[in-house]
Amino acid sequence: EDRWPSGAAGGLVTKDEKYRARCLLITTEKDGEVTQNNDSRAEGGRTGNGKLLACYDVILDKDGYLESYKRINENDEAKGTKWYALLEIHGKSSWYNDQAYLDTLSVEAVKKFVEVTHEKYKETVGNEFDKTVPAIFTDEPQFTRKQVFDNSFDTEDVCMPWTDSVEELYKKAYGADI
């Protein structure tokens, strides 16, 4: 079973990049050093292939409190600190047979995972599925570990969980762009 139906499904699902785990990288350097950790942990990082989603001009007061922020274009000059929001798709890892972990925040990715794993068991044992395979257990569902700044003046890269539908779902729920 090659470590599946655990969260990796032997890399079978994430051969298709659209099903791979993602993170939102918040950084002051659009083209910084690659930091993606490709072991079995759910830590995001810079892959070197980040897609720019947004750019912000952030101004803090002398005590580190937010004075103002606004979304700007990538080539605009910032009055404060320019922050980039980059979409990073998890890279290949030997732990996942040179694939990546699943985007468990994506309904489409999870459906594909179930198709490749659970539905294969059902196909094999047919009507005996709920008897021969009474349950399928995994203790590993995860998504990118959320990182935080040490303080408001920190400019280290941080990652947070992300999936492609976040912007659409946010707008639907709150009536505003993220």
Model-predicted regions and their roles:
Residues 113-116, 120, 169, 173:
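Residues that form generic nucleotide/phosphate-binding pockets
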Residues 178:
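Conserved, charged catalytic cores of large soluble enzymes
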Residues 9, 121, 151, 155:
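Sparse, context-dependent recognition of short Cys/His-centered cofactor- or disulfide-binding micro-motifs
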Residues 82-83, 131-136:
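Beta-sheet entry/capping signal
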Residues 134-175:
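Carboxylate/His-rich catalytic cores and anion/metal-binding grooves
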Residues 105-108, 132, 169:
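Surface-exposed loop/turn and secondary-structure junction residues enriched for glycine/proline
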Residues 120-133:
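Segments forming glycine/polar-rich beta-alpha architectures that bind adenosine-containing cofactors
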Residues 1-79, 84-111, 115, 126-127:
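Acidic/aromatic-lined carbohydrate-recognition and catalytic surfaces
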